[in-house]
Every structure is written in structure tokens, then in C-alpha cells.
């Protein structure tokens, strides 16, 4: 009987420890970076509030295509369900309000896009909360992914990433049929496959889906500094232009 009670006590203690550890793990903060891509909005202050937020978390005075915190970096936010609000900087004028759900210990790129001057109460602002499942590239490689956050661009685009020197996009398509508000998977490329003295970099082409003909929405080089680099390329609008920007916004993804 004594041995049985001892075994039951041990099992109960282990169960309590397991529940406690799971509870602690579930309370680990999320890691968030914020991008202001609302093409018709002035600089923003961002407030995050919710049941797990003890004091309002803020990103402040973010201009169009601004990123906070400085790259590469994230800000710790309580995991779980929260409310995120955008205000014109230094005012109580609300531009948008939306709910988010952030997983424990997960990294996110949060992008506010769409339009602020049409629709009621920020109804035409779109908030993207995209998990950053950042890979460790294979030895000698770099990795890219693309987020389509351009409301004035095509509904879907094809993305070609070509080693320099490049004369234009060629098959196969690197990222095919990327829809507005969606993020691609990461794609791996050899950093310097020909062992050039100066690594050649790449050219990124963004086209309408199914087309390889100019004019391209984007035709821009990118030069990662070293093998092992991981980058997110965000497609956005031109400020007040109602057209896709001819340059992508480059984010550095730490792993």
C-alpha cells in the first residue's frame, strides 16, 4: 500500500509539473514588428491592448513604409487575443482598429495596408499579421519570401528572382500567383554559385500573373551581404499614388 501511495504521489507531482510548464510556455510573449503601408495615411501611433496587456504597448510616429522596431528586431507583445489600434501621430484620431491573435513565442510581421480615407471607421484598412517561420538557410544559400501588400496592384502577381546578370524573367516562376494580402513560402538560392570575386546578387521581377513581358511592376536588384541572409520583400503601393510601388520594401529576418 505504501509503495502504491508513493507511486501515485509521484505521478500526481509529475502531472502538476507538466501542467505548470505548459502554462508557463503558453504565456511566453509573441515577437512583433510593425510596417505602416497605408498609402493615404500620415504617420501613425500604434496601441496594443488586451486582457494580457498590463500597460498599452506602442509603436510611435511610424511614417509610410516605416518599420518598428529598427531592423533586424522585434518587440515583445503579450500572446493571446489583443486589439491593435492605429492613430494619427500625436492625436486621438483613430485610423483603424482590429483584433489579432498572437501565438506564444511566435514572431510576426504585422502590416497595415489598404486605404484610410475611404470607407467608414477604417473599414478599408487591412491588417496583416503574418507568422515569421524564419528558416536557417542551407550552407552557402540565402532565402527570400514575398508579401503582397499592394491594394492598387494586380490581385495576383508572379515573382521571378534571377541571378545577375539577368536579361529578364525566365521560367520557372519563382513564386506563382501570389494574391493580395498573402505571403509566399521562403525560397532558397545559392549566394555565389560561380565563386565570383564580388557576389552578383539577384534581380527581382514582379509581373502580372502569367506574363513575362514588360513593363514589369518591379524590376529591382537585391544584394544580400552574405550567405545565410534571410529577407522578406514587401510589395506596397506608392504613397498617394494608387499604383504598385516600383520598389519593394526589404526586411531583414533574423533566425
Regions found by a protein language model. Name each.
Residues 10-18:
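Hydrophobic helical h-region of N-terminal Sec-dependent signal peptides
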Residues 1-10:
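Bacterial N-terminal signal peptides that target proteins for export
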Residues 24-255:
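Intrinsically disordered, low-complexity polar regions and short flexible loop motifs
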Residues 19-23:
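C-terminal motif of bacterial Sec signal peptides marking the signal peptidase cleavage site
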Amino acid at each position: 500500500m505504501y509503495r502504491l501511495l508513493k507511486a501515485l504521489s509521484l505521478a500526481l507531482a509529475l502531472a502538476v509539473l507538466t501542467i505548470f510548464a505548459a502554462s508557463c510556455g503558453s504565456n511566453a510573449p509573441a515577437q512583433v514588428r510593425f510596417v505602416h503601408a497605408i498609402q493615404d495615411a500620415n504617420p501613425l501611433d500604434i496601441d496594443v491592448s488586451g486582457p494580457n496587456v498590463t500597460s498599452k504597448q506602442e509603436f510611435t510616429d511610424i511614417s509610410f513604409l516605416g518599420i518598428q522596431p529598427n531592423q533586424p528586431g522585434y518587440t515583445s507583445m503579450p500572446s493571446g487575443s489583443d486589439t491593435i489600434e492605429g492613430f494619427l501621430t500625436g492625436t486621438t484620431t483613430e485610423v483603424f482598429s482590429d483584433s489579432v491573435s498572437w501565438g506564444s513565442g511566435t514572431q510576426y510581421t504585422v502590416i497595415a495596408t489598404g486605404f484610410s480615407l475611404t470607407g467608414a471607421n477604417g473599414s478599408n484598412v487591412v491588417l496583416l499579421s503574418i507568422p515569421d517561420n524564419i528558416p536557417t538557410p542551407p550552407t552557402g544559400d540565402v532565402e527570400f519570401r514575398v508579401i503582397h501588400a499592394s491594394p492598387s496592384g494586380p490581385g495576383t502577381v508572379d515573382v521571378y528572382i534571377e541571378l545577375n546578370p539577368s536579361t529578364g524573367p525566365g521560367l520557372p516562376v519563382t513564386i506563382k500567383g501570389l494574391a493580395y494580402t498573402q505571403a509566399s513560402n521562403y525560397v532558397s538560392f545559392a549566394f555565389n554559385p560561380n565563386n565570383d570575386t564580388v557576389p552578383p546578387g539577384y534581380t527581382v521581377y514582379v509581373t502580372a500573373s502569367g506574363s513575362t513581358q514588360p513593363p514589369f511592376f518591379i524590376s529591382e536588384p537585391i544584394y544580400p551581404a552574405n550567405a545565410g541572409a534571410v529577407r522578406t520583400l514587401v510589395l506596397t503601393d506608392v504613397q498617394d499614388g494608387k499604383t504598385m510601388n516600383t520598389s519593394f520594401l526589404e526586411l531583414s529576418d533574423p533566425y
